[in-house]
Structure formats: C-alpha cells, structure tokens
Amino acid sequence: MSFRFWVPGPLPGQNEMIGAAKGCGGRGALYAAMKAKWTSDIVFCILAARVPKGLTRIRCEFEWVSPSKRHDPDNIEAAQKFIWDALCAPKKGRAGAGVIANDGWSQNAGSAHTHRLVDGYEKPGVWVTVVPV
C-alpha cells in the first residue's frame, strides 16, 4: 500500500537554495529560514494526507509539476531535500511528520522522479508517493 500527498509550489530549486546559502555573508541564515519554512509547510501537507507515522523504510516517487521549462529537471529535484526532512521525526528545533525516524541509508530506499508541465487549470507543485519497503 502506498500513500500520496500534494505539496503546492513551485518549490525552490537548486539555484535558489545556493543563493540563499550564500546570502547574509555566506552564513546560511537565509537558507536555514527557507528550509524551516518549506519543511514546516510540507509537514502540514503530510499530516493533512494522513500518511502513517512510524514506517521503517520507504521509497518516494516524485511527480514534479512545473509552470514552465525555465528550470532544468535536476534543478527542480533539489527540493526533495525539504520533503525528505519533513518526512522525518521531529527533532529539537525542527518540524517533522514522523513518517520515518531519519532519512539515512536505513530508512531511505531511494527515489524516482518524473516531470511534466502544468496542464490547464492545474497548479505547480509536486505529488509525492510514499511506498513502504
């Protein structure tokens, strides 16, 4: 059985993440704020979809819905970092949905990515399918 949830976007890409990490004199404060905001928003999406907590090992399938071809697919996929972090158990000072304990090798069985452009009235974002392994 798999579980699916939607994260409205567009999510920040690799270039935005690097720019935020280099901001504020390279101290990473802007990246930390970006990560905290997006992780918290994604946790809400996970909880709203009622993805079960306490899974041992999962694989994630990402279906990225982009508004245009402005960003390369590999740039867009960088946002998976925020999604994996949101799936983890909450830690001191960090939001987490508790679907898995951590996003390390023992819990992360990998991921698959597909990309498509917005179709009609659809909004940009990402569909995430969590598959227990």
Label the model's feature ranges:
Residues 1-133:
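Catalytic phosphate/metal-binding cores of nucleic-acid and nucleotide-processing enzymes, i.e., regions
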